[in-house]
Protein backbone atom coordinates (compact mmCIF):
# COMPACT_ATOMS: atom_id res chain seq x y z
CA UNK A 1 0.00 0.00 0.00
CA UNK A 2 1.00 3.63 -0.43
CA UNK A 3 0.86 6.12 2.43
CA UNK A 4 1.25 9.87 2.03
CA UNK A 5 2.82 11.88 4.83
CA UNK A 6 1.63 15.37 5.71
CA UNK A 7 4.60 16.65 3.73
CA UNK A 8 3.29 14.88 0.63
CA UNK A 9 6.09 12.32 0.70
CA UNK A 10 5.04 8.78 -0.19
CA UNK A 11 5.91 5.66 1.82
CA UNK A 12 5.46 2.17 0.40
CA UNK A 13 4.64 -0.62 2.84
CA UNK A 14 3.72 -4.27 2.27
CA UNK A 15 1.39 -5.64 4.94
CA UNK A 16 1.05 -9.41 5.30
CA UNK A 17 -0.71 -11.69 7.76
CA UNK A 18 -2.74 -11.00 10.89
CA UNK A 19 -1.96 -10.75 14.57
CA UNK A 20 0.74 -9.03 16.60
CA UNK A 21 2.44 -6.36 14.45
CA UNK A 22 6.13 -6.61 13.53
CA UNK A 23 7.70 -3.73 11.60
CA UNK A 24 10.75 -4.45 9.42
CA UNK A 25 13.25 -1.66 8.71
CA UNK A 26 15.96 -2.20 6.08
CA UNK A 27 19.47 -0.79 5.77
CA UNK A 28 20.95 2.07 3.77
CA UNK A 29 20.23 2.04 0.03
CA UNK A 30 18.40 -1.25 0.39
CA UNK A 31 14.66 -1.92 0.46
CA UNK A 32 12.12 -4.05 2.29
CA UNK A 33 12.68 -6.97 -0.11
CA UNK A 34 15.90 -7.52 1.87
CA UNK A 35 13.65 -9.33 4.36
CA UNK A 36 12.29 -11.80 1.78
CA UNK A 37 13.12 -14.79 3.99
CA UNK A 38 11.17 -13.32 6.90
CA UNK A 39 7.86 -13.27 5.01
CA UNK A 40 7.09 -16.81 6.14
CA UNK A 41 6.27 -15.31 9.54
CA UNK A 42 3.00 -13.98 8.11
CA UNK A 43 1.42 -17.27 9.21
CA UNK A 44 1.61 -16.11 12.81
CA UNK A 45 1.97 -12.32 12.83
CA UNK A 46 1.04 -9.10 11.08
CA UNK A 47 4.15 -8.09 9.14
CA UNK A 48 4.85 -4.58 7.90
CA UNK A 49 7.73 -4.28 5.42
CA UNK A 50 8.51 -0.59 5.06
CA UNK A 51 10.54 1.08 2.34
CA UNK A 52 12.06 4.14 4.00
CA UNK A 53 11.74 7.46 2.19
CA UNK A 54 14.21 7.65 -0.67
CA UNK A 55 14.49 3.85 -0.84
CA UNK A 56 12.83 1.06 -2.79
CA UNK A 57 9.28 1.74 -3.93
CA UNK A 58 8.84 4.76 -1.66
CA UNK A 59 8.98 8.29 -3.01
CA UNK A 60 11.90 10.67 -2.81
CA UNK A 61 13.15 11.99 0.50
CA UNK A 62 12.28 15.68 0.37
CA UNK A 63 13.11 16.66 3.94
CA UNK A 64 16.37 16.48 5.84
CA UNK A 65 18.56 13.41 5.55
CA UNK A 66 18.42 12.20 9.14
CA UNK A 67 17.21 9.28 11.20
CA UNK A 68 15.01 11.71 13.13
CA UNK A 69 13.18 12.72 9.95
CA UNK A 70 12.72 9.11 8.86
CA UNK A 71 11.53 8.17 12.36
CA UNK A 72 8.88 10.87 12.33
CA UNK A 73 7.67 9.77 8.90
CA UNK A 74 7.46 6.20 10.20
CA UNK A 75 5.43 7.46 13.14
CA UNK A 76 2.94 9.05 10.76
CA UNK A 77 2.57 5.72 8.96
CA UNK A 78 2.11 3.60 12.10
CA UNK A 79 -0.29 6.11 13.60
CA UNK A 80 -2.41 6.03 10.44
CA UNK A 81 -2.59 2.23 10.75
CA UNK A 82 -3.68 2.53 14.41
CA UNK A 83 -0.83 0.39 15.68
CA UNK A 84 -0.64 0.81 19.43
CA UNK A 85 2.38 -1.43 20.07
CA UNK A 86 4.77 -3.25 17.76
CA UNK A 87 8.07 -5.10 17.59
CA UNK A 88 10.65 -3.24 15.53
CA UNK A 89 13.08 -5.39 13.56
CA UNK A 90 15.89 -3.36 12.04
CA UNK A 91 18.97 -4.35 10.06
CA UNK A 92 22.05 -2.10 9.80
CA UNK A 93 20.79 1.48 9.28
CA UNK A 94 17.33 0.03 9.88
CA UNK A 95 18.47 -0.88 13.39
CA UNK A 96 19.66 2.69 13.85
CA UNK A 97 16.28 3.92 12.64
CA UNK A 98 14.51 1.60 15.08
CA UNK A 99 16.54 3.01 17.98
CA UNK A 100 15.93 6.59 16.84
CA UNK A 101 12.22 5.86 16.53
CA UNK A 102 12.14 4.33 20.01
CA UNK A 103 13.79 7.43 21.43
CA UNK A 104 11.24 9.72 19.80
CA UNK A 105 8.08 7.58 19.87
CA UNK A 106 8.73 4.96 22.53
CA UNK A 107 5.09 4.70 23.54
CA UNK A 108 4.44 2.66 20.38
CA UNK A 109 7.36 0.27 20.90
CA UNK A 110 6.85 -3.17 22.45
CA UNK A 111 10.36 -4.41 21.68
CA UNK A 112 13.36 -4.01 19.38
CA UNK A 113 15.53 -6.49 17.52
CA UNK A 114 18.49 -4.37 16.44
CA UNK A 115 20.66 -6.35 14.03
CA UNK A 116 24.08 -4.93 13.17
CA UNK A 117 23.29 -1.34 14.03
CA UNK A 118 25.59 1.39 15.30
CA UNK A 119 24.44 4.44 17.23
CA UNK A 120 27.68 6.29 16.42
CA UNK A 121 29.79 6.25 13.27
CA UNK A 122 32.78 5.27 15.39
CA UNK A 123 30.95 2.02 16.18
CA UNK A 124 32.00 0.74 12.75
CA UNK A 125 35.35 -0.97 12.30
CA UNK A 126 38.03 0.99 10.43
CA UNK A 127 37.68 -0.46 6.93
CA UNK A 128 33.86 -0.19 6.86
CA UNK A 129 34.15 3.45 7.98
CA UNK A 130 36.53 4.15 5.12
CA UNK A 131 34.18 2.31 2.73
CA UNK A 132 31.30 4.58 3.78
CA UNK A 133 33.21 7.67 2.65
CA UNK A 134 34.16 5.96 -0.60
CA UNK A 135 30.58 4.82 -1.25
CA UNK A 136 29.19 8.28 -0.59
CA UNK A 137 31.73 9.91 -2.92
CA UNK A 138 31.08 7.34 -5.65
CA UNK A 139 27.31 7.85 -5.50
CA UNK A 140 27.72 11.62 -5.70
CA UNK A 141 29.99 11.35 -8.73
CA UNK A 142 27.84 8.82 -10.59
CA UNK A 143 24.75 10.78 -9.60
CA UNK A 144 25.92 13.59 -11.85
CA UNK A 145 25.17 11.33 -14.81
CA UNK A 146 22.75 8.63 -13.61
CA UNK A 147 19.45 9.34 -11.76
CA UNK A 148 19.57 6.03 -9.87
CA UNK A 149 22.86 6.97 -8.25
CA UNK A 150 21.69 10.51 -7.57
CA UNK A 151 18.92 8.96 -5.50
CA UNK A 152 21.42 6.79 -3.65
CA UNK A 153 23.61 9.81 -2.95
CA UNK A 154 20.66 11.54 -1.29
CA UNK A 155 20.46 8.98 1.54
CA UNK A 156 24.04 7.69 1.72
CA UNK A 157 25.04 10.36 4.32
CA UNK A 158 22.96 8.37 6.81
CA UNK A 159 25.83 5.88 6.85
CA UNK A 160 27.80 8.43 8.88
CA UNK A 161 24.99 9.77 11.06
CA UNK A 162 24.76 9.13 14.79
CA UNK A 163 21.51 8.23 16.52
CA UNK A 164 20.45 11.48 18.17
CA UNK A 165 18.71 10.23 21.32
CA UNK A 166 19.69 11.07 24.92
CA UNK A 167 20.87 7.88 26.61
CA UNK A 168 18.65 8.66 29.59
CA UNK A 169 15.62 7.85 27.45
CA UNK A 170 16.94 4.38 26.67
CA UNK A 171 17.71 3.77 30.35
CA UNK A 172 14.01 4.23 31.14
CA UNK A 173 12.76 1.98 28.34
CA UNK A 174 10.42 -0.76 29.66
CA UNK A 175 10.55 -2.99 26.57
CA UNK A 176 13.01 -5.80 25.66
CA UNK A 177 15.85 -5.01 23.28
CA UNK A 178 18.02 -7.63 21.59
CA UNK A 179 21.23 -6.42 19.93
CA UNK A 180 22.33 -9.07 17.44
CA UNK A 181 25.60 -9.16 15.49
CA UNK A 182 27.78 -11.71 13.76
CA UNK A 183 31.27 -12.45 15.03
CA UNK A 184 32.50 -11.36 11.58
CA UNK A 185 30.37 -8.20 11.53
CA UNK A 186 31.52 -4.75 10.46
CA UNK A 187 30.29 -3.41 13.81
CA UNK A 188 32.68 -3.35 16.75
CA UNK A 189 31.74 -5.99 19.31
CA UNK A 190 32.23 -3.65 22.27
CA UNK A 191 30.01 -1.06 20.60
CA UNK A 192 27.14 -3.53 20.20
CA UNK A 193 27.54 -4.67 23.80
CA UNK A 194 27.41 -1.04 24.93
CA UNK A 195 24.14 -0.50 23.05
CA UNK A 196 22.55 -3.48 24.80
CA UNK A 197 23.70 -2.17 28.19
CA UNK A 198 21.87 1.11 27.61
CA UNK A 199 18.54 -0.67 28.10
CA UNK A 200 17.28 -2.21 31.38
CA UNK A 201 16.02 -5.18 29.35
CA UNK A 202 18.84 -5.15 26.82
CA UNK A 203 20.52 -8.35 25.66
CA UNK A 204 23.59 -8.84 23.47
CA UNK A 205 23.76 -11.83 21.10
CA UNK A 206 26.67 -12.74 18.85
CA UNK A 207 26.16 -15.33 16.12
CA UNK A 208 29.27 -17.34 15.32
CA UNK A 209 30.29 -17.68 11.69
CA UNK A 210 28.09 -14.78 10.58
CA UNK A 211 28.80 -11.29 9.28
CA UNK A 212 26.58 -8.32 8.53
CA UNK A 213 23.70 -10.17 6.83
CA UNK A 214 22.21 -12.58 9.35
CA UNK A 215 18.60 -12.11 8.09
CA UNK A 216 19.68 -13.53 4.72
CA UNK A 217 22.53 -15.88 5.60
CA UNK A 218 21.04 -17.38 8.78
CA UNK A 219 17.32 -16.77 8.31
CA UNK A 220 16.18 -19.79 10.34
CA UNK A 221 17.95 -18.47 13.43
CA UNK A 222 16.84 -14.90 12.77
CA UNK A 223 13.20 -15.88 12.28
CA UNK A 224 13.22 -18.02 15.42
CA UNK A 225 14.54 -15.05 17.37
CA UNK A 226 11.78 -12.82 16.03
CA UNK A 227 9.13 -15.40 16.91
CA UNK A 228 10.51 -15.81 20.43
CA UNK A 229 10.58 -12.07 21.07
CA UNK A 230 7.06 -11.55 19.72
CA UNK A 231 5.67 -14.45 21.75
CA UNK A 232 7.35 -13.27 24.95
CA UNK A 233 6.07 -9.73 24.43
CA UNK A 234 2.51 -10.97 23.97
CA UNK A 235 2.72 -13.02 27.16
CA UNK A 236 3.88 -10.01 29.16
CA UNK A 237 1.69 -7.24 27.80
CA UNK A 238 -1.67 -7.26 25.99
CA UNK A 239 -1.21 -5.54 22.65
CA UNK A 240 -3.75 -4.50 20.05
CA UNK A 241 -3.90 -5.89 16.55
CA UNK A 242 -3.16 -3.56 13.65
CA UNK A 243 -6.30 -1.85 12.43
CA UNK A 244 -6.70 0.28 9.36
CA UNK A 245 -8.64 3.48 9.76
CA UNK A 246 -11.56 3.85 7.45
Where are the regions that the model predicts?
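Conserved HGGG/HGGXW glycine-rich cap/lid loop of the alpha/beta-hydrolase fold
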Residues: 9-57
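Active-site loop/oxyanion-hole signature of alpha/beta-hydrolase fold enzymes
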Residues: 48-87
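Catalytic histidine-centered segment of alpha/beta-hydrolase-like enzymes
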Residues: 210-223
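Short beta-strand/loop motif that positions the catalytic acidic residue
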Residues: 173, 179-181
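Flexible "cap/lid" loop of the alpha/beta hydrolase fold
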Residues: 96-104, 110-138
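Conserved loop-alpha-helix segment in the C-terminal half of the alpha/beta-hydrolase fold
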Residues: 39, 181-210
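Conserved alpha/beta-hydrolase "nucleophile elbow" surrounding the catalytic nucleophile
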Residues: 86, 90-95
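Active-site nucleophile elbow and catalytic-triad environment of alpha/beta-hydrolase enzymes
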Residues: 153-169, 184-187
Amino acid sequence: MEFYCKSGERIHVDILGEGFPIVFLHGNNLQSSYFAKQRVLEKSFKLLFVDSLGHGKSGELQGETSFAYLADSLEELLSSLSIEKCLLVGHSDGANLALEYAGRHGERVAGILANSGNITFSGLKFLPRYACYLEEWLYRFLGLFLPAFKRKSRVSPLLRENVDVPKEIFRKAPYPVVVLVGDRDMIKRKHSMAIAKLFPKGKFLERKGQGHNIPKKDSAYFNHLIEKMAQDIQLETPVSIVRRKN
